[in-house]
Amino acid sequence: MKKLLLQLDSSRLPSVFDQVVAYDAGADAIMSYGGVTEGDVRDLIHGCIFTRGPKDLHNTAVWIGGNNMSAGEQLLALAQDTLFAPFSVSIMLDSNGSNTTAVAAVVKIEETVGDLHGRKVLILAGTGPVGQRAAGLLAKDGADVTITSRKPEQGEKARQFIDARFNVGVKSVAMTDPSTLPELLDGVEVLLNSGPAGVQMVPKAAWSGVKTLKVAVDLNAVPPLGIEGVEVDDAAERRGGVTVYGAFGVGNFKTKLHKACVAKLFTRNDLVLDAEAIAEVARGMSKAKR
């Protein structure tokens, strides 16, 4: 029986990237829909669950993507509400690659630092979907997490979302210019940049002298890079006693994780792969390679 993936994309054009990765992960056919709204979800999901017997439904799965994570979360909630036993299929949410990117960064940090309980983490520009999910996962690891934002109200809104979504407690601080970096970096062991492409967030002089710093991860792949001194293809390189990862260093693992998760969707018919479940897949991959 063919493995069928239903791609629900909130953007007008379904992601070609996601389709290519899904085929590489073992999907036999992909049914792609773009511009999917909340009102479309029920009938599309019904088309998945009522066409094969319950014992065969693990061969059908749903992928939710698009450029807007908030829209993706709404589609996921509606898709879950449409399913009922025994008519269920596995679903994965990864709008704009936010879940797999955040998880890949978190697992690389875990590999480097080990136990994160009580360790001080600073996430620059942590108000976007990647920063929020990384913050939530690291806080669930027991880390003392602070996110930064240029606008205090935006940071507070993100903090409230993270705390509610992941049942954790993170902090938010405003970072309007680099002059505040020395104070923000004081005692930090983990530095993660999830800021906008092409914007340098941290000059090398600001982080290279932080004696407590153990790992720095920059998810910006567009020059100028977000953390000066971290190269885009760095993968566990050592710079001044600090282990560093660039966007491609994280991205290579992210793509492998993406494929592994799509493959996992076809192993059973009741999986929901959101940030936490994707993190468990990634941690399993990390352990397997040691």
Describe the residue ranges of each PLM region.
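Conserved active-site and cofactor/substrate-binding residues in soluble primary-metabolism enzymes
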Residues: G35-D40, S70-Q74, T100, A104, ...
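Adenosine-phosphate binding glycine-rich loop
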Residues: V222-R290
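N-terminal ligand-binding/catalytic initiation module
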Residues: M1-P86, A277-R290
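Short glycine/serine/threonine-rich phosphate/pyrophosphate-binding segments
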Residues: A102, G128-A134, G155, V199-V202, ...
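Rossmann-like adenosine-cofactor binding region
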Residues: V170-Y245
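Glycine/charged-rich beta-loop-alpha catalytic/anionic-binding loops adjacent to active sites
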Residues: F84-M92, R239-G241
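A glycine-rich, Thr/Ser-enriched phosphate-binding loop motif common to dinucleotide/cofactor-binding enzymes
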Residues: M92-E110
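Glycine-rich phosphate/diphosphate-binding loop of Rossmann-like nucleotide-binding domains
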Residues: E111-V190
